[in-house]
Amino acid sequence: MAIIPDKQDSTVLERKQQKLKPPSMYKVVLLNDDFTPMEFVVMVVQEYFKKDRETATQIMLKVHREGRGVCGVYTRDIASTKVEQVVTHARQAGHPLQCVMEEA
């Protein structure tokens, strides 16, 4: 804020407008491995990314064929939480599934 004197010996505060920019977005990406069952990947995509079965299957096939598949794009905190949830669930189930986040 800037202080601007006016003509009557009083002070008026002038508020400067701040330009807000949208938050940085991050892709959550599943990486292929030779051990995690395809059905487990589909279940993870449905549970943590709220995709229907058909979409989850398409993402799983992309991971299987191309080595990686994007599950969604989120703000940093949400993407980080989803990565942590997926990796934790995979480890608890005994699978080496990898999930990472990348700047979109």
Swiss-Prot record:
InterPro entries on file: ClpS (IPR022935), ClpS_core (IPR003769), Ribosomal_bL12_C/ClpS-like (IPR014719)
Cited SUPFAM superfamilies: ClpS-like
Pfam families per UniProt: ClpS
A GO biological process held by the record: proteolysis
Origin superkingdom: Bacteria
UniProt family annotation: Belongs to the ClpS family.
Protein function: Involved in the modulation of the specificity of the ClpAP-mediated ATP-dependent protein degradation.
Subunit structure: Binds to the N-terminal domain of the chaperone ClpA.
PANTHER family linked: ATP-DEPENDENT CLP PROTEASE ADAPTER PROTEIN CLPS, ATP-DEPENDENT CLP PROTEASE ADAPTER PROTEIN CLPS1, CHLOROPLASTIC
Protein name in the entry: ATP-dependent Clp protease adapter protein ClpS
